[in-house]
Every structure is written in C-alpha cells, then in structure tokens.
C-alpha cells in the first residue's frame, strides 16, 4: 500500500534502523525490489529521479508502482521523487501520485535553499506528501548533475537546526563526506560521524544518507568478470553504513549498486551466448542479482522484518 514517506521513516527514526531507498528506471528493477521487500518483510522506499521519470513517463512510473502495491498489499511503500531540482518538478510529482518528494536546492546559497524548500513543504504538506531536503553538497554525478571536489561542502549542524525548524521539512540529507556514483573516495574512506550525530541531536528528525552505494565485492567481481570496467571505484564500506545508522541515518539511498548488479548479468548472458536475443534470458538473471543486493541491504540496514 502506498503511504507517506514519513510513515515509514518516523518508525525507523523512533526504533533506530535504516530503510534502503532504491531507485528504478524500468519494470524489471521495480519488480526485483518489490520481491525483495516481500521476501524480507521490509517496508519499501521506491525512488525515481527526474531523469528516470523522463525516461519512463511519470504516469507509467506511478502506474507500475501502484500495480505492484496491489500485488503486495501488505508492504508499506513510499514513492519518492529523488533530487527534484525545481518547485515545478516536485509539484508535478505530487499531482501524479508520489507520496514523498525531495527538493534538492543544495547548490543554492543557504537562504535560497531554505526559501525554496519551505515553498515545496507548504505545497506538499497541503497534499499530504512528505518532503526531503539536502544541506551541504555531495561530490559526484547524480542524474547528470555534477559537483566537483572543490565545490563539495559538508553540512553545518547549526544551519541544519535552523533549516529544519523554519522549513518544517520532514527529513534531511546532510552532507557528511559521501559522494554520488561509483567513485566515492580518492583515498581511505572517511565519513564525519561526529557531524552526523550533532545534526541528529539538533534536528531530531529522520536523516538521509545520499551516495550510499557500497559496491560489494561479489557485485564488483561479477561486473569485472563480465568484462566491465570499474577501475578506481570505491563504495561506502558496510561498517560505515551501520555506523551511520547508529548516528541517526534512517533512509539510505542506493542506486549504483543496483545498476552494476543488473548490468553485470546482462553482460554475462551476452558474452556467453552471442546468438541470444530473448530479452527474458537477459533480464531474469539480472532481476535475481538485483533482488539479492536489495535483500542483503535490507538485512544490513535493519528494515527486514519491520512490517
């Protein structure tokens, strides 16, 4: 059943666990995520970026999620707009049936971010929809939005306190050192957990970790064995994800891991049987690989058996 994002995250906030927020761009990804949620008895945060919506069509994206909710009526599901860049894109998502939206104005100055976020919150709350915002700037590329290392900024906890109080945003993504994509760290992985804990103490709302894909060893190996190139890639270590939850993270965004796992299996089939053109032969193992990544992440973050 479709529910407000806050219905899922406030429970996680109160009980101290994390919920994976999984991106999708087609039916195969969506089906695998729902199957994982069903098998692990976990609530679901389903995400679509502006780019994914452009690719699928917003009505198709919402329609597929609603059909899957009918198939699995016992699973609480939030449908979330990931990295909405304008008021208009958030409003369009709300009108289309999304139950949670993110307004990402982190590239603006603090006051402009606060003003735009407050405007989105008012609109969305009037429609019964939850809102996420971001403070600080993450390095990396997300849906063709690029932030260089020199422009990445960690969150200021005091600003976060004021931002949450004045905007009335439901959950906040503080920049604590992660980055988008498969190349998250140049040296040893490092996240500012003390900063995270201070943000949690001052805001006392659900917090979100962006750029949280781990690139697990088995997923990396499958991709490399199939001829893929991930030279220099580094994900967020599993122990960092667990430590971030202890520090107050309740929503953990995961996209890159899903893409890598899925494409690895597609490459494998293509390499092993060059005469194969039955799409089901490609997508069935790809869905299984993606489902297994999601299931393991649910157990790691603590959302398994939380329905």
Curated annotation (Swiss-Prot):
It comes from Helicobacter pylori (strain J99 / ATCC 700824). Gene3D superfamilies: Aldolase class I. Its EC number is 4.1.2.13. Catalyzes the aldol condensation of dihydroxyacetone phosphate (DHAP or glycerone-phosphate) with glyceraldehyde 3-phosphate (G3P) to form fructose 1,6-bisphosphate (FBP) in gluconeogenesis and the reverse reaction in glycolysis. The keyword Zinc applies. Belongs to the class II fructose-bisphosphate aldolase family. D-glyceraldehyde 3-phosphate binds at residue 49. It holds the Pfam family F_bP_aldolase. NCBIfam families: cbbA, fruc_bis_ald, PRK05835.1. The active site is at 82 (proton donor). PANTHER family: D-TAGATOSE-1,6-BISPHOSPHATE ALDOLASE (PTHR30304), D-TAGATOSE-1,6-BISPHOSPHATE ALDOLASE SUBUNIT GATY-RELATED (PTHR30304:SF0). Dihydroxyacetone phosphate binds at residues 181, 211-213, 253-256. Keywords: Glycolysis, Lyase, Metal-binding, Zinc. It catalyses: beta-D-fructose 1,6-bisphosphate = D-glyceraldehyde 3-phosphate + dihydroxyacetone phosphate. Zn(2+) 1 binds at residues 83, 180, 210. Binds 2 Zn(2+) ions per subunit. One is catalytic and the other provides a structural contribution. GO terms for molecular function: fructose-bisphosphate aldolase activity; zinc ion binding. Pathway: Carbohydrate degradation; glycolysis; D-glyceraldehyde 3-phosphate and glycerone phosphate from D-glucose: step 4/4. This is Fructose-bisphosphate aldolase. Homodimer. GO terms for biological process: fructose 1,6-bisphosphate metabolic process; glycolytic process.
